[in-house]
Structure formats: C-alpha cells, structure tokens
UniProtKB/Swiss-Prot annotation:
GO terms for biological process: arginyl-tRNA aminoacylation. Keywords: Aminoacyl-tRNA synthetase, ATP-binding, Cytoplasm, Ligase, Nucleotide-binding, Protein biosynthesis. The lineage of its organism: Bacteria, Bacillati, Mycoplasmatota, Mycoplasmoidales, Mycoplasmoidaceae. A motif ('HIGH' region) lies at residues 130-140. It is found in: Cytoplasm. SUPFAM superfamilies: Anticodon-binding domain of a subclass of class I aminoacyl-tRNA synthetases, Arginyl-tRNA synthetase (ArgRS), N-terminal 'additional' domain, Nucleotidylyl transferase. It comes from Malacoplasma penetrans (strain HF-2). This is Arginine--tRNA ligase. The keyword Mitochondrion does not apply. Its main location: cytoplasm. The gene is argS. Its EC number is 6.1.1.19. The keyword Cytoplasm applies. GO terms for cellular component: cytoplasm. It catalyses: tRNA(Arg) + L-arginine + ATP = L-arginyl-tRNA(Arg) + AMP + diphosphate. Belongs to the class-I aminoacyl-tRNA synthetase family.
Length: 564
C-alpha cells in the first residue's frame, strides 16, 4: 500500500531545505512540485523559489541554488541530481536506486499499486437518483459513471465511502406512473382508453402492464377511476407500488450491467413513514417563521436572495422540505463507524440554482458551509450520421442507458462519459465505434496494453530468470518519461481524490499509452545482443502494463488484449 507519493517526499525535503537555509517555514500547499513538462528538464520540478522570492526579497534563481545545495549535501537516495534554472525553477532528476525501488514495488503490489493506506475520512456520495418512472437515459449514464469512478478513486485513496441512490417516490410523478400502467393494463384487457397527456408514454408502462395482466388477467378491468385516480385506494396503491418496484428493478439491472453499485437505496417515502420532517423543522429552530399561514425558512440569513417556503398554507410540504430532511439524515450518519466528513451530490446543470439554496439550508441546521459539495454536470448528446437523438421520458423518445450500452458497449460508454470534465458538454459519435477503420481513445490505450502483453508473453522465460530490477541502462528519454509517469500514478489518484476531476484518469492513461506507442515505433525493444538492457526494458513494460490495468480498473474497465 502507498504511504506517501514521490511528490510528497520531494516537498518534505524542500520544506526542510527552506527551514534550514532561510529560517522560515513554508506550507506544503503554498508551492508546487509536479511532473516536468519535458523529461529533458528532469522528472519533476518545483516553483518554490519563485514563491519565496517576494517574502525573502531575493532573486529566485539564488534561492533555488541554495535549496539545490542543501539537497546535494543532505544525502538522499531520491535524487540523481537537482538543478536551478532561470527564472527560478528547481529541476529534479530521480536516482536509479529509487527507480529500481519503484519497479520492485509495482511488481510486488501488482493490482494494489496505487492503493493508499486507510484514512479516517468518510464521504457519502449520492448520484443518479432518477425518478423510478422509466429507464435511465444517457444523462443518468454520465451521472452514474462520474459517481462510481469518483467513489473508486476515493476508496483507492483510503477513504471510507457510502454510495447512495435517493428514490424520488414521494411526488405526483409516481401516481402518474401508476395511472400510466393502469391505462396500459386496460388497453391490454381490450378497453379503448387514451393515455392522458402527462402520463408516461414509453415502453416501460406497457411492459409492467403486461406483467400485471399475466398475473391477474382482467381482475381490475371494471374498477372505477377518473383521469388521475383509481377510486379503490388498495387498487390504486397496488398499481403505483408495483410499477415503482418494477421500474426500480429495471434501473438496478441497468446500473449493475453498467458496473455501478450502491450501498444504499433510500426512498423519499421513508422520510414520511418515519415522520422525519417535523424533527428537522424543529432542528431548524430560530430560522423558521410563519407568514401568510405558511412556514418559511430564513435563508437570507446566510446570503440567499429570498426566504423559502418549506410548509405551504395548506400544511403540505414544498419539495424543498423533504430534501432538507434527507440531507440532514445523510450529514448526521456514521459510515462504518466513522462520522460523515462530507456529503456529495452529482446533479445535472438544470439543478445548478438549487446548490446555494441547499447549502444555506444545511447552515440553518448548524452544519458548516462546506459540509456539502455538489458536482454539476452538463448534458450528453449522442449523434449518428450527423443527427441528434432527443430525450423525453413521457413521449417515449428517450435515449436510454441501455441504448448506449447496445450502441457502443459498456467499456466505451464508461470511458467516453468520464473523459471530459463534468462541466463540459459531451457529444458521442456512434460512428466512431461502429466504423471498421475508426479508433477510439480507449482502444488506443488497450492497443498499448496488448502490444506490451504480447512482448511479455514472448519473453516470459527471460523475465522469470531475472531476480533484480535495475534501471541504469534505461537512458532513452521515452523510457525516462514512462518511469516518471509510473511515479506519478499514485499522485494522480491523490490529486483526483481532492479535486474530483475524474476525467484526469483517461488523460493519464492516454498519455502513458501515447508514450508507449511512440517508444515502440522508435526503439528496437527486443535487442538480444544486450540481455541486461532487454531485461530492464521488459521490467519497464511490465510496470507500464500494470499501471494501465490499475488505471482502467478505476473506470471499471477490464484491461484486455485486442486481436488486431
């Protein structure tokens, strides 16, 4: 397991150097150590001297030189050398010793390379949370991919994670679903009835109605009903609850097939069954007041543009109130014995305006402002032959998660939905995956994995007889660059755990694959005239493939050998 990253180790040494040379303490977050943009200038670099220049009133290049002098005089197996370059950067060249240790660690850890020691940090992340009124559409697919991948990264970083799906079953939409299924059932029984305009027109109500008909035949054909309600409450409840359960079963199956799982499904109806709203109102205390027969929440106390109604004058709750109660439940839970440090939501851009309102509500409950973080994602567009599919559940024209899987497969879907920042719009061109001469970014990465795997298989006996992991002959710049990338993999996980930018996993993997393909094209890897060099290269390739495999696993994509 990873205790610390190479960057953290370099930062600690630089911090010690600053304290020794300049008698001041610098915060680790105040300066950068990162992978060098070009391997010619070192494996890593730091801007610490330029950060200190104004404080020390000194030329940054002179500061950098003094830090390099400290690092040179204090023996460490980390560095081959360091150099100060204008205007004040410090370039770091890693030693062969630490590179050899890296190869040993990767080959020892294998699938767990990049997994950190457990930390006492617990997060709840709620995502997807689609109304159980139809199949998940491709917007939900992106939400699911983001949430699951972020959960995977946090777990790899050592956090305790609870993944949650909120079932919105408390509103009128579920009643409409039940009536939609009832009308389809009547049609199945031979009745000439027309669906109401706000009913769900998709295939799911038809499928559920057929299940009911198969079990009960025409048992309910003569019940009395209006446009929006079945008079017999038990029959109405049956159609509503049965429909909700069946739709949730469809959703759960699609999520499972998409490699997405949840630790908890929490229905909104449970909030009412357990009478959790009134205690939440009481907890809001002084921030609740009555006006015009309604209860208002004084959200303006925390910067909202206006106060919000939480209980209407007819004593019914606004949709805001059960949401407040639900977020209170999440924020006060323990997760595997740990208090919840932060709650996360992934919402579509159409809910962006709701973020500040919910943040303020949690402050009214006594939580810190940063108890909740919301990742707002943009929509997804699927095109084929230049035409866009439109989405509307009620009209039955929704492009579903299942459609996406059928069109381009689970692995391609997961990659494409993660490969851009959440705030960016995504357009997926189906032709890219169905045309024989097209290459997707995922296939490019898998092709790199495949190339390496075939080389390793052909040289399996040579690898087995080698007991050491030397790196002194790996002097090619692309070899050095790949080694630096291997060092950087755990840091990538650490960065994403704090920035939530999961699209940086595909970027990392594509960059590593690109290096491999370039190396493969330019270098005669299998050079049998130099056995030691060949062994070192094989060990490098072995490590590269392990990191590709581990990185893909964070996306729930299996590393597999392509046949081309």
């Amino acid at each position: 397991m990873i205790k610390t990253t190479i960057i953290a180790s370099i930062k600690d040494l630089i911090k010690d150097a600053v304290k020794d040379k300049f008698k001041i303490t610098i915060d680790l977050n105040d300066f950068v150590v990162d992978k060098a943009k070009s391997i010619e200038f070192g494996d890593f670099y730091s801007n610490v001297a330029m950060i200190l220049a104004s404080k020390l009133k000194k030329n940054p290049i002179l500061i950098a030189e003094e830090i390099c002098e400290y690092l040179k005089n204090h023996k460490t197996n980390l560095f081959e050398s360091t150099e100060a370059v204008k205007p004040g950067y410090i370039n770091v060249f890693l030693s062969n010793s630490v590179k050899s240790d890296l190869f040993k660690q990767i080959n020892k850890d294998k699938d767990t390379y990049g997994i950190f020691e457990p930390k006492k940090v617990a997060y709840n992340i709620e995502f997807v949370s689609a109304n159980p009124t139809g199949s998940l559409h491709i917007g939900h697919a992106r939400n699911a991919a983001l949430g699951q991948t972020l959960g995977n990264v946090w777990k790899a970083y050592g956090y305790t994670i609870e993944q949650e799906y909120y079932i919105n079953d408390g509103g009128n939409q579920i009643n409409n679903l039940g009536m939609s299924v009832f009308y389809r059932y009547l049609q199945k029984c031979g009745k000439d009835v027309q669906m109401e305009e706000d009913f769900y027109q998709g295939s799911e109500p038809i499928a559920v109605a057929e299940l009911i008909y198969k079990e009960h035949k025409d048992k309910f054909v003569n019940v009395k009903y209006s446009a929006t309600k079945i008079e017999d409450e038990k029959v109405f409840d049956f159609f509503r609850d049965f429909s909700k359960t069946e739709l949730m079963n469809i959703i759960k199956k699609d999520l499972k097939d998409f490699s997405v799982h949840f630790d908890r499904y929490f229905p909104e109806s449970k909030i009412y069954e357990m009478k959790l709203v009134d205690p939440t109102i009481k907890k809001l205390g002084k921030y609740v007041y009555e006006k015009d027969g309604a209860l208002w929440l004084k959200t303006t106390e925390f910067g909202d543009d206006k106060d919000r109604v939480i209980v209407k004058s007819d004593k019914s709750f606004t949709y805001f109130m059960p949401d407040i109660a639900y977020h209170d439940i999440k924020a006060t839970r323990t997760i595997n014995g740990l208090k919840t440090d932060k709650i996360f939501n992934i919402w579509g851009a159409d809910h962006a305006s709701y973020v500040d309102r919910m943040t303020v509500a949690l402050q009214c409950l006594g939580f810190k402002k940063d108890i909740m973080h919301v990742i707002v994602m943009q929509m997804v567009k699927l095109t084929k032959n230049g035409k866009e599919f439109k989405m509307s559940k009620r009209s039955g024209n929704s492009l579903t998660l299942r459609d996406l899987i059928n069109a381009i497969g689970v692995d391609n879907s997961r990659w494409e939905l993660i490969s851009q920042a959440a705030e960016s719009h995504i357009e997926i061109d189906v032709e890219k995956f169905t045309s024989a001469d097209s290459t997707s970014n995922l296939s490019y990465v898998l092709y790199a994995y495949s190339r390496i795997q075939k080389i390793l298989e052909k040289n399996e006996s040579l690898l087995k007889e080698s007991k050491s992991y030397n790196t002194d002959l790996l002097t090619n710049l692309k070899e050095k660059d790949m080694i630096a990338m291997l060092f950087y993999y755990p840091q990538t996980i650490a960065n994403i755990a704090k920035s939530y930018e999961v699209h940086k996993i595909p970027i990392f993997l594509y960059t590593l694959a690109n290096l491999l393909h370039s190396y493969y094209s330019e270098v005669k890897i299998i050079d049998e005239s130099n056995k030691e060099l060949l062994i070192q290269r094989l060990h490098l390739l072995q490590c590269v493939n392990q990191v590709i495999k581990n990185g893909l696993k964070l996306l729930d994509i299996e590393a597999k050998v392509l046949n081309k």
